[in-house]
C-alpha cells in the first residue's frame, strides 16, 4: 500500500498558486488511475483510492491549510497502518528552479511549513517529490511569492514537470525509486 500526499491549500483562490503544485500533481496522477477525490472529514482531507499492479494507492489532499498538513497525514497513516517508507509527499520547492524535479527520502524540511507539520507527527523518514517553483525576486516576501499564481510560461514549465512525474509514476509502484529519481 502506498500513501501519496499532494500538498497545497484548499480553496479556489489558491488553486493555481505555486504553493499548490502538490495538489495539481496529485490530481493529475490520480486521474491517470481513473480515481477521483471525495471529502473525508474524519481524515481532514480529500481522498482517492485505486489498485494498480495489485497494490492499493491512497491519494490525499489535506483540507487543512498547508501549516497543518500533518493532521491529515497522521490520521490516514494511522488508520491504514502505512510505514513512512511507503509515503510520498509531492510539494513545491523554492530552492529549485521552476519545473525542476528532485526526489529524496528523509532530510530537512527546507523551511517548508507543510513538511514541518508532517515531520512533527511522523518524523522525516518519508519520500518527497519536490517540484521547483523558483525563488522570489527583488526581496519579495516568500509567503506572498508562493501564494501567487504562476506566469503563463512558468505554468507551462511546471505542467511539463508534472507530466513527467505522472508518466513515470509507475516506477514508484514497481519500487524502482532509483529509476524514478533519474
From Swiss-Prot:
Its EC number is 3.1.1.29. The record marks 92 as: Stabilizes the basic form of H active site to accept a proton. TRNA binds at residues 14, 65, 67, 113. It is found in: Cytoplasm. InterPro entries: Pept_tRNA_hydro, Pept_tRNA_hydro_CS, Pept_tRNA_hydro_sf. The record marks 9 as: Discriminates between blocked and unblocked aminoacyl-tRNA. Signal peptide: none annotated. GO terms for biological process: protein quality control for misfolded or incompletely synthesized proteins; rescue of stalled ribosome. Pfam families: Pept_tRNA_hydro. GO terms for cellular component: cytoplasm. One of its GO terms (molecular function) is peptidyl-tRNA hydrolase activity. The active site is at residue 19. It is an enzyme of class 3 (hydrolase). Keywords: Cytoplasm, Hydrolase, RNA-binding, tRNA-binding. It catalyses: an N-acyl-L-alpha-aminoacyl-tRNA + H2O = an N-acyl-L-amino acid + a tRNA + H(+). Belongs to the PTH family. HAMAP family: Pept_tRNA_hydro_bact. PANTHER family: PEPTIDYL-TRNA HYDROLASE. Monomer. Hydrolyzes ribosome-free peptidyl-tRNAs (with 1 or more amino acids incorporated), which drop off the ribosome during protein synthesis, or as a result of ribosome stalling. Catalyzes the release of premature peptidyl moieties from peptidyl-tRNA molecules trapped in stalled 50S ribosomal subunits, and thus maintains levels of free tRNAs and 50S ribosomes. NCBIfam families: pth. This is Peptidyl-tRNA hydrolase. It comes from Rickettsia peacockii (strain Rustic).
